[in-house]
A protein has these predicted regions:
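Basic, glycine/lysine-rich polyanion-binding surfaces/domains
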Residues: 1-97
Length: 97
């Protein structure tokens, strides 16, 4: 088993956050359950993989710092008429994978 340690997370919150993210990733969100997922392009191709975690009305995406910036930019392309915020935050978290 390996450890995956991150020091940043992309946090998504707001009224439409869950439906917005759920429509763009490969696995359905489930509150309190971290899981691997993929960000899919409109044609269904894998754009990025990451760990996603839903905590109530907030969603946290964990990946390397450079990838988080790319994921945020990708999500912002599809965030029109959607009430949610996307912010990079500092965290200290480690996953056993």
């Amino acid at each position: 088993m390996k450890r995956f340690t991150v020091n940043k997370s992309l946090v998504i919150n707001g009224k439409d956050a869950i439906s917005f993210v759920d429509s763009l990733i490969s696995n359905s969100l489930k509150d309190g359950m971290p899981k691997f997922s993929y960000l899919l392009s409109p044609d269904g191709k894998v754009n990025s993989w990451f760990i996603v975690y839903q905590a109530g009305s907030e969603i946290f995406i964990f990946q390397d710092n450079d990838k988080l910036i790319q994921i945020k930019e990708f999500l912002l392309k599809y965030k029109f008429r959607t009430d949610c915020n996307l912010d990079l935050i500092d965290v200290q978290y480690s996953f056993a994978i």
